[in-house]
Amino acid sequence: MLRFVTKNSQDKSSDLFSICSDRGTFVAHNRVRTDFKFDNLVFNRVYGVSQKFTLVGNPTVCFNEGSSYLEGIAKKYLTLDGGLAIDNVLNELRSTCGIPGNAVASHAYNITSWRWYDNHVALLMNMLRAYHLQVLTEQGQYSAGDIPMYHDGHVKIKLPVTIDDTAGPTQFAWPSDRSTDSYPDWAQFSESFPSIDVPYLDVRPLTVTEVNFVLMMMSKWHRRTNLAIDYEAPQLADKFAYRHALTVQDADEWIEGDRTDDQFRPPSSKVMLSALRKYVNHNRLYNQFYTAAQLLAQIMMKPVPNCAEGYAWLMHDALVNIPKFGSIRGRYPFLLSGDAALIQATALEDWSAIMAKPELVFTYAMQVSVALNTGLYLRRVKKTGFGTTIDDSYEDGAFLQPETFVQAALACCTGQDAPLNGMSDVYVTYPDLLEFDAVTQVPITVIEPAGYNIVDDHLVVVGVPVACSPYMIFPVAAFDTANPYCGNFVIKAANKYLRKGAVYDKLEAWKLAWALRVAGYDTHFKVYGDTHGLTKFYADNGDTWTHIPEFVTDGDVMEVFVTAIERRARHFVELPRLNSPAFFRSVEVSTTIYDTHVQAGAHAVYHASRINLDYVKPVSTGIQVINAGELKNYWGSVRRTQQGLRSGRSYDASCNAYRRTYSWRCPRRVDRTGGQCFSRVNVIEPSHGPRPTRYILQEPGTYPAWIRFRNRVQAVSRQKATHFLFDIVPAAVISDFTTSDTSSFAYKSHTYAVNVTALRFSDTYALYVQTDTNMTILSPAARRQASATYSQVAGFCYNTPTVMDSLANILDVDRNIRPKHFKGLRLYTRSKVTAQHHTHLRPDELVEAAAKVSPRRKYYLMCVVELLANLQVDLEAAVATILAYVLTLSEKFVPIFLDSRAIWVGEPGPDALTARLKASSGQIKSIHTADYEPLTELFELAVLMNRGVGHVSWQAEKDHRLNPDVAVVDQARLYSCVRDMFEGSKQTYKYPFMTWDDYTANRWEWVPGGSVHSQYEEDNDYIYPGQYTRNKFITVNKMPKHKISRMIASPPEVRAWTSTKYEWGKQRAIYGTDLRSTLITNFAMFRCEDVLTHKFPVGDQAEAAKVHKRVNMMLDGASSFCFDYDDFNSQHSIASMYTVLCAFRDTFSRNMSDEQAEAMNWVCESVRHMWVLDPDTKEWYRLQGTLLSGWRLTTFMNTVLNWAYMKLAGVFDLDDVQDSVHNGDDVMISLNRVSTAVRIMDAMHRINARAQPAKCNLFSISEFLRVEHGMSGGDGLGAQYLSRSCATLVHSRIESNEPLSVVRVMEADQARLRDLANRTRVQSAVTAIKEQLDKRVTKIFGVGDDVVRDIHTAHRVCGGISTDTWAPVETKIITDNEAYEIPYEIDDPSFWPGVNDYAYKVWKNFGERLEFNKIKDAVARGSRSTIALKRKARITSKKNEFANKSEWERTMYKAYKGLAVSYYANLSKFMSIPPMANIEFGQARYAMQAALDSSDPLRALQVIL
């Protein structure tokens, strides 16, 4: 609602008007200026136009059983399906309300048959309309209302009303009648739980007067006026209870006659609004209030027609469907305590706006009434193709569905997304007008019938007539071509000139007549088949805007013959004789509405109040805002396209509701500069400075990306700009709109509708849009245009409906570079980091797979082989990855990839190819649109080079750490900021109190992996050299407990050793920290990431489904801005990191043991003494700043400072910044405007927080944690990138160990193939690759095809890899683990102190009901598998002799998944050991008990968790 009003205003501040009435009517006055430009001269007329509106109407309102909506109730009392979790409610009664167990059990039995229906829309509508009627009373404007009579000298129309205005009431009274009505039985209620099945209202925050108001709104509503919102309504419930501290008796006394009407009057409008505010806020009914406000606004008023035919519109009344009332929110006192669930961001925003300015509802109703009538008329115009043809392909089915009837009309009129009502089976519709050619007969008094279709004293009107001109939403892109409603158009020459006039197309004739009437001329015409005698275009004398003539929908009328142009008595602008070839001049007409005010009667004039989006920000504290995709299509919108009207979920990429398929062929390279597409233009951006830099554009084809409109046009930097470059179009394309050097109008392209300012450059126009424009409510293509400018996409192609032209330009497609001769596969080398076990697929295997897919795919791969050979790229992993990529790439992208000069032409060698791939894909991210033309398959092409390319400059690394370029922030403000964040976590985070003994007892489970280093000789006794033994897992588990606890005595410092991490397409420096700092830090800040989960998706909250949901929540009703830090680790000063640690220590010091407090002080001091061993000189140097990548606190520190820098820079204080997510150096911000992104970059620059501008994507990609969350992949989560999947498919991570079991290998292969299937559309390629992987497994491990097949199909409880619910259990996979060989440097894990300590801890957890040695053997066996050397495991399959038992295990598989709170569960599961630490706490104790009751508790835990 708020966004619709704001979008349809002239600037970002909206004009708002309070309800007013003069006998049911008011008038909106507008001051208008129209410019006429011809012969390099400009003439203008400033004049006033007005539009009457009537509040009179008689809608038919039906109350039907609707759906129950429990949004706003605390999350913990709801099920995953959105129902009420009764068990949780009963547990709450026992635990916090002090209700005895037998009383709770009895209550549970009583409520088994109760209904849990909750819907407050009917009550909220009663309260909202009572408020508006009371405002009229206080203004002295309350009356029954009447419809004004129409009299134009030809006909007279007077429509009857039910109640005579002179005999009607003069003030609002209670809508019920105590003398005749029966009232609901209500009673005050304050107990902990209900006793009868009736609605329970929760009105605890309301005053007695406000409670009385709510009670009366539950009563029957009698219609006492003719106003549309004063509709008849039954009492909302026969019985109900209200939860309040006091028994309110005023209403009862009035009903019983103990109080007079004067003693019990309706409260003032302020009290009503206060009651409404408190009721909605306390019950958290934001979604339902949104629905109520939408419905009321849609029926509140209609425009009073200024033509006789328009009165047919007033004869049709709406059919409104409202759900019956129900309430369960007051049944229990705690249902509304805690985080509210399922609140819509759009609803929350509208609620905030309406409570700030209630006038928003009335203003929205004015705009809707105009757009509804105009849209219904345009439906017929578009459906009939301007009368020239019946367009059966034009989709207008949205008009036939009641839930989308109004929204279809709004979208048809404005070209914008029209928001739905937010609830199913709730609607406003006009059933008599479902067919666009419905006939209406208007009773009239005939004075002069010429020009009217009159039959039996009735005016016959076909379809919905035009009742008004769209002043309230002007300018509006009502058509895809230039027209008077868009704000700017050009009068073109006639089709042909005759002796007595000129012949025009129908639309051109309307444009001509419209302009002439404003200038002071009448236009006479003739059309074929006219039988009514109409000879002049009609315009009301009150506004002079000519209506769209009725004949445009007549299929028999092809052209209009303009016979004469006659000067009126009141003439304003002298124009040439436009219907004469000798005097014709091309005339450009521009219209602007300057201001608006409303008037109700002679002396009641109301000027607009203003509301600014900057001051309307939903308060999200304690509210879980969800995304539209999780509700249903009723939280979506309706959009107008060239094919018709389409409905779809808001911002839900998975449905691709607005995608259009274009027939596209790649143009020849030499042809790419001409034609309609502007693909090679020079877009300039002046540098940022204290004053705008002026540019004189002399070179053709040069356009400023950012300009400032003041008294003149200036090319400026983005920080100073008011407008940004949006599109470039040929002058001929918009010649109907403008021929001037500068002009503003509403423009509808094939992919977007937006208000633009056109600036002429030679024979083209650059279209500019205000930087403060709300881009979220525009189309995806419009956001793509903005992203291209913001990210400076050099190869972006303007004036094209598809992104494919831009791709062809960015990749510089040239078919001539494709190989003509093929020599086959070459001999390929392996990079030094690639061991045998890291490679899964090789080039020959991929070519063989391609042959099974299709000959064409094999041809594509052979082309790649030759292209790579020409570039001298012979790395096996890179070749295999690129082959896998082309094998799985969508068909439409393969040619432009193979024919790309930007990729395949240039310096030879892997590094040069990597650089070109990186440069190309970087631009592609900025033109991606998730819900229009997704390009995720082309992201991150540099990843295709896989591992082993690139290098690390250790001298540069050293320079960065000795001379750091860090963010500059005030440390006192940083401490306060971070401390507040940590304090806010105490509701959800509990600091883990422990001693050294507790900590070391569980070290087997929490010990981190990775290489181990120590600067102390005594630690080296437990560090075992060797590829498989020099790691923290072995070292820490070999150490006795006392050795670890004594580490605290060492000086506080952090020592780091350098190493290289081989990543996709690059190498990165890694700094592995010393063992002691790692263990002490982990002890002091155990699971410290959990302190951030209340605010950021880290730790357990970083799971893919949770992150995807969180990001979708954030982007509901907003767009994304991905801020990319430049080498974030190097931007932290030592002072900033020390401050963060001190804030953590001071926040949780009271929760620490003495040993933890000592360790925490050690950690704080250690960050001041950080040293790195130079790999070249082998000397230690002390860090002057920056963060070490291998530190225990890397993610924690990066996440905290990531958020803190933005907080201190003032990013979150910017008006348009709505929300953000942070994890490590990743950050995504939700916003709506280009200007906001510019201000964010500026704010971060001021504190020296560096970003990579080219990677800061605005509106295009919603990337967070390397996943595009703007669209859904095959698994229903965010879409990941094909290039990454191909790289993983070919080559393992360097850190991974050699797989020891065929089952483990096949399990990993299955996961990789599943990821690949979610990212590619070539499923046949996935099948062929799977066959190659299985073939490779049988060869390496020496197993038969039948065993591989059995492993694929058998359920996991039988040793297979299938997780299907009904996977077979008849076959069991046998693995001989005893055949593993462990390194000779280390003894058997059964003798390790860490294994013994952990086994003892688990034994104690089981209550000593399980043999200690059995537990120890299991832990030792899991440890043994981590250090095994060779593939000596024997895998066989045989018939399962205990199939019945396996069926039970299959049934219970993962039955308690998610209940175990073990932080390091993945480690345990990998070792085939169930996660055991902490499972005796919380809900996980149920899993513990279930395991103990089983015959084999260890096996049971493994299955059920």
Swiss-Prot record:
Pfam families per record: LA-virus_coat, RdRP_4
Domain of life of the organism encoding this protein: Viruses
Further details from the record: One molecule or two of Gag capsid protein is replaced in the virion by Gag-Pol because the fusion protein is essential for RNA encapsidation and replication.
Statement: the UniProt record of this protein carries the keyword Transferase: yes
Record's keyword terms, sorted: Hydrolase, Nucleotide-binding, Nucleotidyltransferase, RNA-binding, RNA-directed RNA polymerase, Transferase, Viral RNA replication
Record keyword Transferase present: yes
Family of the protein in this entry: Belongs to the totiviridae RNA-directed RNA polymerase family.
Coiled-coil zones: none
SUPFAM superfamilies reported for this sequence: DNA/RNA polymerases, L-A virus major coat protein
Enzyme Commission no: 2.7.7.48
InterPro entries given in the database record: DNA/RNA_pol_sf, Major_coat_LA-virus, Major_coat_LA-virus_sf, RNA-dir_pol_luteovirus
Reaction(s) this enzyme catalyzes, per UniProt: RNA(n) + a ribonucleoside 5'-triphosphate = RNA(n+1) + diphosphate
Main function: RNA-dependent RNA polymerase which replicates the viral genome. Catalyzes the transcription of fully conservative plus-strand genomic RNAs that are extruded from the virion into the cytoplasm where they function as mRNAs for translation of viral proteins and also as substrates for encapsidation to form new virions. Once encapsidated, the positive strand is converted to dsRNA by the RNA-directed RNA polymerase. Displays ssRNA-binding activity.
Record lineage: Viruses, Riboviria, Orthornavirae, Duplornaviricota, Chrymotiviricetes
Protein name as annotated: Probable RNA-directed RNA polymerase
GO molecular function: hydrolase activity; nucleotide binding; RNA binding; RNA-directed RNA polymerase activity
An example Gene Ontology biological process: DNA-templated transcription
